[in-house]
Amino acid sequence: MSEPQRALPTPANDADLPDASRGAKRIGGHGRFRWAVVWTLIGTLIPGLGLWHAGRRVAGAVVMGLFAALVLAGVYLGTAGRDRVTTLGTNVGVLSGLSIGLLVLAVVWVAVIATSHLALRPLRASGAQRVTGGILVGALSLAIATPLAVGAEYTWSGAQLLGTVFADDPTDPGGTTSTDPTTAANPWGAKERINVLVIGGDSGTNRDASLGLRADAVMMASIDTRTGASTLFSLPRQTARIPFPQDSPLHKYYPNGFYDGVNGGNAEYFLNAMYNNIPSRIPKNLLGDHVKNVGAEVMKIGVGEALGLGKADYYVIINMDGFKSFINALGGITLNVNYRIPIGGKTTENVPPIGWIEPGRDKHLNGRLALWYARGRYHVKGSDYSRMERQRCVINAVVQQARPDVVLANFEKIAAAGAKTIQTDIPRNKLPAMIDLALKVKNTNLHSVVFQPGVAGWVSANPPWPAVQRRVQQALKEADKAEGGKTSTPSASAATSSSAKPTKSSSSKSEDLSDSCAYNPAK
C-alpha cells in the first residue's frame, strides 16, 4: 500500500513562487487580455521589458542589456562625427558585418516579441484572444523586421558596390597618392588640388567588342581640397599630339606626343584612340606591374601633361551604355534644353534621327533622353563642341541633384547601376576623404573650360599646349577667387554654353555652370 502524499506548504506570498509561476499568476490574476496586449507593445519598443514584467527576470535583463548596448552604439555613431561615420561606412568588412548583424537582430527581436506575448498572455486565453494575439505578434514582427531587412539589403548592396568598383589594395592602388603627412581633419595633407580624369566610354551593346572602349568624352576635374572649388576642362575627342613628360617611359615611344609624325588628322592618333591603341603598342609592364588599366593610366599621364597639371591622381570611367540605368536609378535629371537635340541619326550617312528632345526650361529627362542630351549631334552646329558643352551640364545636374534623400530612396538601384557603369582606381581607404571633398564640391558652383576654336588659340590637329596650360592656370585662379568669397568673378552668359556656337567671352573667362547651363533658347 502506498504511503499517503503530504500536502505542499502554501507560499505566504508571490515572492515565494518561482519566476514563471509568479508571472503566470500575475497575468491570470489580472484576468484581462488587454494588459497582455499593452505589455506586448511595450516589450516590442523596449525589448526585454515584456519578459521582465512576465517574471522572466534573467532573460528580460539580458535582452534589455543587449538592447541598451545597441542604443549606446547608435548614440556613439550619431555623435562621432561625419569622418568616423564615413570611414566605417566605406569599409567593406564593416558593411558586410552590419548587414548580417541586422538580419540576426531582426530574427532575435521577432523571437523576443513572440516569447514576451506568450509569457504575458492569460493561462486560459480564449480562442479569440489567441487569434488576436497571433495577429498582433505578426503585425509587430513585420513592423520591426521590414526596416531591418531593408537596412541589411542596403548595407549588403553598398558592400558589393565598394568591392566591385573601388581598388582593393590601398597600399598600391595605381593612383597617385600624396606623401605629405595627413590627419583626420586634413586627409590630403599639403596636397592643395586633386585632379580626376573623367572618361565617358562607349563600349555599349551596339559596339563591336573587339574594338574595345572608345573614349567618347574626356574631361579633367581639378578640385581644390580646401574649398571644393572645381573646374572641368574638356578636350575634344579628336585632339592630336597629346604629349608625355620626358621622365615618363611613354616619351621614348612618343617623343613628339601621340602623333604619327605626318598627319595631325589621323584618327588612329586622336585622344579618343589612346585608350585602346597605346596599350597594344607598348610592353605590358612598361608603366609598372601594379597598373591594372594601362589605357586609363596612359590617359592620366598624357591629359595631365597636356593641361599642365601633372599626372591625374585618379581616373573614373563611365560606361555610356550603363549611364542610362544610373540616371534612371536617380529618378532622372532636370536640364535646360536650349535647342532641338537629335535622338540618334548619323550625319555622314544621312540617316535621320528617330526623334528630338525639344527646347524647354527645366525638362526632366530619363536615362535614355539624358544620354542623347549628352551625345546627340545630328546636324547640330558645332557638333562635337556643342556636345562637350552639354556633357558638362549633365555632370553638373548629377552633382547638384543627387541629394542624400534621393540617393537613399534609390540606393539599391544606384548601387546596381554604379557597379555596371563605373570603373575607377580610387582606393577604398581614400573614400572618406573623397566623400568629404564631394560634399564641398556640392556646395560650390562648378566652373568649366571647353577647349575649342576661340579658346587659347585652339586647333585640334596641333594644339598650342603652352597657351592651353596658361589658360588652365587662369581658370583655376578664377574658380578659387569666385569660391573663396573675395570677389565674384563674372561668368560667361548663359548663351555661351547653351548655344552650339562659341562666343568671345568663352575664351576670356571660365564659365560658371549654373549660368552656362541656364535656359537661354537659341534664336
Positions of PLM-derived features:
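Hydrophobic, aromatic-rich membrane-embedded alpha-helical segments
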Residues: 30-59, 64
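Cytoplasmic membrane-interface segments at the C-terminal ends of transmembrane helices
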Residues: 50-58, 109-132
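Non-catalytic, solvent-exposed segments at the cell envelope interface
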Residues: 154-523
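Internal/C-terminal transmembrane anchor helices
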Residues: 126-160
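Juxtamembrane loop-transmembrane helix junctions in multi-pass integral membrane proteins
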Residues: 31, 54, 89-96, 131
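Membrane-embedded alpha-helical segments of integral membrane proteins
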Residues: 68-120
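Acidic/Ser-Thr/Pro-Gly-rich, low-complexity N-terminal segments
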Residues: 1-26
